C-alpha cells in the first residue's frame, strides 16, 4: 500500500482542505470507491491519504502541474 496527497485526475491539483488533522471530507474522499484508501486527513491544507492501492494516482501527476505553466 502507498500513501500520498489525493489528486484530481482532470486538473492535477491536490484536494484542498482547511480543517487540519482529522478531517471528515478528506477521510470520505480517501475512502471513496475511485480512490480505495484506508484513512484520510488534512495535512498542510491538502488531503493526505493512507493505505492507497498502487493504482490510485497521488500528487504530483507527471505532466499535470495544477494550472501552473
From Swiss-Prot:
CDD domains: neurotoxins_LC_scorpion. Residues 2-67 form the LCN-type CS-alpha/beta domain. Residues 1 form the signal peptide. Keywords: Amidation, Disulfide bond, Ion channel impairing toxin, Neurotoxin, Secreted, Signal, Toxin, Voltage-gated sodium channel impairing toxin. It is found in: Secreted. Expressed by the venom gland. This is Neurotoxin Cex7. It comes from Centruroides exilicauda.
Amino acid at each position: 500500500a502507498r500513501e500520498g496527497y489525493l489528486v484530481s485526475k482532470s486538473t492535477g491539483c491536490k484536494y484542498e482542505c482547511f480543517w487540519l488533522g482529522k478531517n471528515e471530507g478528506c477521510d470520505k474522499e480517501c475512502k471513496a470507491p475511485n480512490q480505495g484508501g484506508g484513512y484520510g486527513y488534512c495535512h498542510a491544507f491538502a488531503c493526505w491519504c493512507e493505505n492507497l492501492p498502487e493504482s490510485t494516482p497521488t500528487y504530483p501527476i507527471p505532466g499535470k502541474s495544477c494550472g501552473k505553466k
